[in-house]
């Protein structure tokens, strides 16, 4: 069993919810109701009949959604609220940071889910990753950003980083090295910030990321100043070609930038953690990559 699967199943087993639980019941949960709508894509209306087994209908660009992962994420934020932790930090009307703290002084991570810039698939593509990373000792943020276009979304990520660096003690951060993670549209966001920094997107200059971790994106832009880059994609991805990702990393390697690339068989777009697929365990490979190339991140 992969370590990420073990963590997800542990939290899923603690959940009071199940497949038949209406999404509206989760939204009304007294522990998390102040921010629960951002657990799910808030750009698309969820019919009242939708249950937690229907979440995949809200994420049309994603695949391999698992009920256990959804339950685990919800239980994690409920646990944090029971401990009186502040889970969601609003940065604007529809912009904010979920924060899963850790007890160690490891560098932190910021994760942006994808959704084609038409919705934010956090329940599948950033919050599960944040849960796993935090359980492994890495403080992790998951970004809620505005949909409607890449520029707007990247500006929201820059705002999030500027907010973190403005007062890191607010989040209990001791180590200010960090990594940027993202899936699909979120990977584009991470790559842009990794290449050009917050100062290129309306914020003061912040320290650059130590590494970028990318899932399945057709992003081709890069710079000579890119950080170490790890990328994963399915070979049957009809949205983001694995060859496009491979070529970008080849260009980074030519600049002596550390890279690692994985293309998985029998797998399409939007697989998230990839539990139950040929990509299962990729997040552990990503952690090892960063630790090898930029130290104990």
Predicted regions and their residues:
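N-terminal cap/lid segment of alpha/beta-hydrolase-fold proteins
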Residues: 34, 40-104, 196
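Short amphipathic alpha-helix adjacent to the substrate-entry channel of hydrolases
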Residues: 123-141
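Short beta-strand/loop motif that positions the catalytic acidic residue
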Residues: 231-233, 237
């Amino acid at each position: 069993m992969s370590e990420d699967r073990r963590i997800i199943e542990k939290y899923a087993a603690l959940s009071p919810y199940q497949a038949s639980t209406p999404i509206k019941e989760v939204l009304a949960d007294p522990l998390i109701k102040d921010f629960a709508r951002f657990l799910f894509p808030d750009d698309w209306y969820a019919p009242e009949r939708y249950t937690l087994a229907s979440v995949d209908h809200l994420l049309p660009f994603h695949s391999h959604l698992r009920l256990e992962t959804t339950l685990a994420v919800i239980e994690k934020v409920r646990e944090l609220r029971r401990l009186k932790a502040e889970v969601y930090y609003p940065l604007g009307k529809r912009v904010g940071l979920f924060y899963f703290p850790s007890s160690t002084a490891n560098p932190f991570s910021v994760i942006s889910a994808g959704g084609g810039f038409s919705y934010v698939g956090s329940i599948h593509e950033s919050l599960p990753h944040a849960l796993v990373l935090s359980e492994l000792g890495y403080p992790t943020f998951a970004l809620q950003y505005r949909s409607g276009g890449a520029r707007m979304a990247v500006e929201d990520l820059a705002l999030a980083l500027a907010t973190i660096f403005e007062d890191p003690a607010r989040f209990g951060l001791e180590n200010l090295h960090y990594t940027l993670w993202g899936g699909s549209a979120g990977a584009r966001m991470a790559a842009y910030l990794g290449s050009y920094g917050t100062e290129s997107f309306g914020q003061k200059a912040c320290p650059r990321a130590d590494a970028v971790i990318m899932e399945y994106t057709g992003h081709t832009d890069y710079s000579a100043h890119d950080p170490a880059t790890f990328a994963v994609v399915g070979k049957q991805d009809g949205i983001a070609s694995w060859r496009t990702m491979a070529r970008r990393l080849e260009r980074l390697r030519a600049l002596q930038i550390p890279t690692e690339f994985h293309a998985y068989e029998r797998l399409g777009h939007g697989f998230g953690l990839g539990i139950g697929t040929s990509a299962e365990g990729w997040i552990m490979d990503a952690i090892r990559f960063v630790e090898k190339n930029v130290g104990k991140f």
